[in-house]
Amino acid sequence: MLTDIEISRQTKHRPITQIAEKFGITSSELVPFGDAKAKVKLSILKRVDDNLEGKLVIVTAVTPTPFGEGKTVTSIGLTQGLNALGKKACACIRQPSMGPVFGIKGGAAGGGYSQVVPMEELNLHLTGDIHAVSSAHNLAAAAIDARLFHESRMTADEYREQSGQAPLNIDPEKILWRRVVDHNERSLRNITVGLGANNGPIHDSGFDITAASELMAILALSLDLKDMRRRIGKLVLALDSLGQPITAETLGVAGAMTVIMSDAIEPTLMQTLTGDPCLIHAGPFANIAHGNSSIIADRIALKLADIVVTEGGFGSDMGFEKFCNIKTRVSGKTPDAAVVVVTLKALKANSGIDSQNDINRPDMARLQVGFANLKWHIDNVSQYGAPVVVAINRFPTDTFEELTWLKAKVLETAAFGCEICEGFSQGAKGAEALARVVVSATEQKSDFKFLYQLDESIESKLLTIAEAGYGAAGIKLSPDAKIQLQEINSMGLDKLAVCVAKTPLSISHEPKVKGVPTDFELPITQLKINAGAGFITALVGKVMTMPGLGIKPGYLNVDINEDDEIVGLA
């Protein structure tokens, strides 16, 4: 079979203006970036405000494995299948980070005959939104250190006289705002800044990947430009010598940060291989952030489409939980149906197999053991009240016996339906059966409910997520987390939502514990204030906000061929 990039190149793409026109976006609402992609102006929201809203389908998955479950493939395939059935459907997905693109995961455009094209443009830069987030984020870091430097070299009266501003008295040991870059770079996780004459004061800092920036979460959760400006102003960058928060508004940098991101707030329109619309916007990771594409993209799509397909990162314990408890609270739009993606490989891997050869070999015994993980995710999604459809993403090595057994087994659970999806190999045709079941699911009553209420304490919300969202026996706060909890409570931020940052490779905090872990205590190591985004991030176990490159990074395969074409992107 051809590679993803070869399939993308061999398919004739329609001009993005035609995709927009067919979807209902006028030329005055479009800012093209070449023929393949275009920004969509937010002015469209006013024009379509009276339109009826379409149905919203959220795609999630079982616990991720190194073999890939195909969540984006399924999301794009489902969108293609829905359109093939005569529904007006649109996909809304996140913008890929170049960290994973050049790391081990690869791109995030889907794959095979269910992908967003041109895939290389999606996976590399797109329309520059991630760079805008990086620049705005790092401006705040520079502003903090500049203020710290100038205040440290003169008296309070001298500073007030020369700057016209009151000193902020930033505590160098309480600077909460780190720097970001859109690459996997473990050596930058912890650094010391201010070294050398006239560069201080010296203090510890570090880099996170841009997808972990609170600004990325703000971009995804903002309702419009004014809302983004308001949220950026609430960013807590540091504490002063009395332990009081210093915000981006206080520092006077919020306006400039907003201006840098003013174009980034517009989603980007692209297309699938079959010419179906896809809105790409924002890129927060689901393990270290809230892991969903933007509310703005959803709002536009829902006013133009019958059905909108979006996805939450990683398994249902990660992106789906945050979709429900964070994104939905802000958007006010609850899901009409949820799709859980599974593969035979994933079930075998969650039974304890990690060999590629063993994974591809038929093994009913291993499937039965691994099925517990799928059932856990079905039950986890079901507790939120939306109808659940299981999509079996088929691989060439899957046997008829295994697939038949799995489909029958799923129908014994709380799932509304189950269907095999072959979007990767067949595109729209291979996803039509799944699309029919999903349409039926969206016509059922959805009795959505949150996992917790915002007026609960931070500890109560964490305990609920741990017990009901992961199956944990309880939580344990580290000494640092207990101090941070006191600070959060003293600032009156205890009514914010909670975003748990943990490994995606297990339902628990231990990446090597597969299947359905039980009788474990969730260790909360740190609590981070994300007042602009509207949540408190709880770091669990050994989770890192800056990934590192592996021994065989993806960049080794990427190059330019003799025809000046990009090769090696996966």
Curated annotation (Swiss-Prot):
Q: Which UniProt keywords apply?
A: ATP-binding, Ligase, Nucleotide-binding, One-carbon metabolism
Q: What is its EC number?
A: 6.3.4.3
PROSITE patterns in UniProt: FTHFS_1
**Which GO molecular function annotations are given, in alphabetical order?**
ATP binding; formate-tetrahydrofolate ligase activity
What is catalysed by this protein?
(6S)-5,6,7,8-tetrahydrofolate + formate + ATP = (6R)-10-formyltetrahydrofolate + ADP + phosphate
Which CDD domains does this entry report, sorted A to Z? FTHFS
Establish whether keyword Ligase is in the entry: yes
Could you tell me which pathway this protein works in? Answer: One-carbon metabolism; tetrahydrofolate interconversion
Q: Which residues cross the membrane?
A: none
Q: Please list the GO biological process terms of this entry.
A: tetrahydrofolate interconversion
Q: Where does ATP bind?
A: T65, P66, F67, G68, E69, G70, K71, T72
Q: Which family does it belong to?
A: Belongs to the formate--tetrahydrofolate ligase family.
Name of the protein described by the UniProt record: Formate--tetrahydrofolate ligase
